[in-house]
Amino acid sequence: MATSLTPADPLQEAAIVLFSGGQDSATCLAWALSRFGRVETVGFDYGQRHAVELACRARLRDGMAALDPDWATRLGQDHTLALDALGTVSDTALTRDAAITMNENGLPSTFVPGRNLIFLTFAAALAARRGARHIVGGMCETDYSGYPDCRDDTIKAMQVALNLGMASRYVLHTPLMWIDKAETWRMAEGLGGADLVELINRESHSCYLGVRDVMHPWGHGCGTCPACMLRRAGWERYVADGADA
């Protein structure tokens, strides 16, 4: 999200990254580490079926710190917040043992109403305590499942609401908003080379069903849920583009 609030030297600034342990948030963490002087991460345990993603976070953080000494210096504290209530009030295929289907409203049954709105609110509250002005999220409306809380208009509205409601000057960054999954892999390569791509491929998690014991060329997963299909298609385009270059 473009803004005039970003200082000339963001290395003097701190950022909070919404960090689930997935491909998108891992790429966003690398993006933030390349730009801000102190970067902290926050993950949310809301009763998701794919809670295995939370276990991936530490390995990704450690791996990124090992890739670049500057990143190691900038990488700050990790936070995990329990949001059990979100899982309690949500009757979705991400928080219940239910089949993934398409609802009558055109949204997949994996949509958790209000999830990103709640995540951003808690991230802003944490940022206030930790002295961070920048909040980074992996929301995207290019290669995505149609979730309304991933849209650019939603993020812009949340930035306004958070700043009004907290009398602050937060800047919400969504570096993946207008790129697809293939371009997300390409961004990771640009940020940290083939080593970062390999780290994200091997250690991040996208599968909605939490399948971790099956490894594909594009990463772990069941291979059939919407998240796996998006990740696989993006990887295949990324590899094909590389082969054509």
Swiss-Prot record:
Its cofactor is Zn(2+). The keyword Cell division does not apply. The keyword ATP-binding applies. It is an enzyme of class 6 (ligase). This is 7-cyano-7-deazaguanine synthase. Its EC number is 6.3.4.20. Belongs to the QueC family. One of its GO terms (molecular function) is ATP binding. Zn(2+) binds at C207, C222, C225, C228. GO terms for biological process: queuosine biosynthetic process. Binds 1 zinc ion per subunit. Keywords: ATP-binding, Ligase, Metal-binding, Nucleotide-binding, Queuosine biosynthesis, Zinc. CDD domains: QueC-like. The lineage of its organism: Bacteria, Pseudomonadati, Pseudomonadota, Alphaproteobacteria, Acetobacterales. Pathway: Purine metabolism; 7-cyano-7-deazaguanine biosynthesis. ATP binds at F19, S20, G21, G22, Q23, D24, S25, A26, T27, C28, L29. It catalyses: 7-carboxy-7-deazaguanine + NH4(+) + ATP = 7-cyano-7-deazaguanine + ADP + phosphate + H2O + H(+). It holds the Pfam family QueC. Catalyzes the ATP-dependent conversion of 7-carboxy-7-deazaguanine (CDG) to 7-cyano-7-deazaguanine (preQ(0)). Disulfide bonds: none annotated. InterPro entries: QueC, Rossmann-like_a/b/a_fold. It comes from the Bacteria.
